[in-house]
From Swiss-Prot:
Segments traversing the membrane: none
Modified residues (N6-acetyllysine): 59, 82, 144
Binding site for heme b: 63, 92
Sites bearing S-nitrosocysteine, chain numbering: 93
Keyword Metal-binding on entry: yes
SS bonds (residue pairs): none
Modified residues (Phosphoserine): 44
An MF annotation (GO) of this entry: metal ion binding
Protein name (Swiss-Prot/TrEMBL): Hemoglobin subunit beta
Keywords (A to Z) from UniProt: Acetylation, Heme, Iron, Metal-binding, Oxygen transport, Phosphoprotein, S-nitrosylation, Transport
Residues with N-acetylvaline modification: 1
Organism for this UniProt entry: Otospermophilus beecheyi
GO cellular-component term (any): blood microparticle
Domain Globin intervals: 2-146
Length: 146
């Protein structure tokens, strides 16, 4: 992902204000509610029968934090996203058989959740930078599918 120095600074500043526990769980929860077919990958998570159940599910919150921690690691390796996400790409492709389109959907949901949490600090410039990164991460996660 190619980012200008200004975009990198905007990302770094914004990301420093993100609570991974809250944002990760909310992003994954929203994905599961808005795109219910994605729930089939989370059979072991228990009750996903309603939006309230999904958003309050401790396994959704815990896995959302793991997802956000991986994303955070990706922010440290923007010049090598494919390498950074190679093992996760292999897992999601070969073992879990996740449709790679779901990575793009999760990235878009994450941007919405970040906007909600960052409020006025989520400027158009910050949004543009995050959109580039989530697209790059989605492509890296889909890499083993090609």
């Amino acid at each position: 992902v190619h980012l200008t120095d200004g975009e990198k600074n905007a990302l770094s500043t914004a990301w420093g204000k993100v609570n991974a526990d809250e944002v990760g769980g909310e992003a994954l929860g929203r994905l599961l509610v808005v795109y219910p077919w994605t729930q089939r990958f989370f059979d072991s998570f228990g009750d996903l029968s309603s939006a309230t159940a999904v958003m309050g599910n401790p396994k959704v919150k815990a896995h959302g934090k793991k997802v956000l921690d991986s994303f955070s690691n990706g922010l440290k390796h923007l010049d090598n996203l494919k390498g950074t996400f190679a093992s996760l790409s292999e897992l999601h492709c070969d073992k879990l058989h996740v449709d790679p389109e779901n990575f793009r959907l999760l990235g878009n949901v994450l941007v919405v959740v970040l906007a909600h949490h960052l409020g006025k600090e989520f400027t158009p410039q910050v949004q543009a930078a995050f959109q580039k990164v989530v697209a790059g991460v989605a492509n890296a996660l889909a890499h083993k599918y090609h």
